[in-house]
Amino acid sequence: MAGRRENQAPLPVLAAATVVELQGRLLGWYSANGRDLPWRHTRDPYAVLVSEIMLQQTQVSRVVPKYHAWLQAYPRLEDLAAAPLDAVLRSWQGLGYNTRARRLRDCAAAAVRTASGSDAALPRSLPELLRLPGLGPYTARALLVFAHDQDVAAVDTNVRRVLTHELGLSHDLGATDLQALAEAVLPWGRSRDWHIALMDYGALVLTARASGVPWRRREGTPLVRAVSTSAP
């Protein structure tokens, strides 16, 4: 992970009241406006993994039917690991970027090989997850969040956009500072809800590129825009 770039300003210190306000507003917005998506009704790590890999670079509307069909064809890690690659790729058709299907199958195969019991399972710690093929820092953290509600921060481009915009910070924060920011505003005990709120807010309100600008809100001004000066 890249750190702070040379000559980059230090990350401002957020006032506690700002953090609490951001958490309350985003979670309140989510409780009233959150999307109902099938992978949000499960805590099965394998199903969560399938959804996370499918959602990379593919629209939600295209993923939903494929997600259901995939879990019918390969309901367990063992089923996917044992499936011929050509069958897996056929099941993936329509989602694009076939390397994701290969990575998903490789990950399942590795989990099965390292299983200590009769049933394969994905690890529950970040270091162990990162040792599996095809899992990067975001996907590994997302598994811990959505399957186990662990208090870790999972940062992707949408989370970057929401946090930096809503807190009035530079969108070009270095990866180290961005991770520190995400951890600083994480409401402990509500990690899963918080990350879903960030994702839905980024998808429905603070949209990605539109009309030649980096992002565009569909309503008003930022939820919170109060950042203190840097710590001495």
Predicted features and spans:
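Catalytic cores of DNA base-excision repair glycosylases
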Residues: 10-18, 24-231
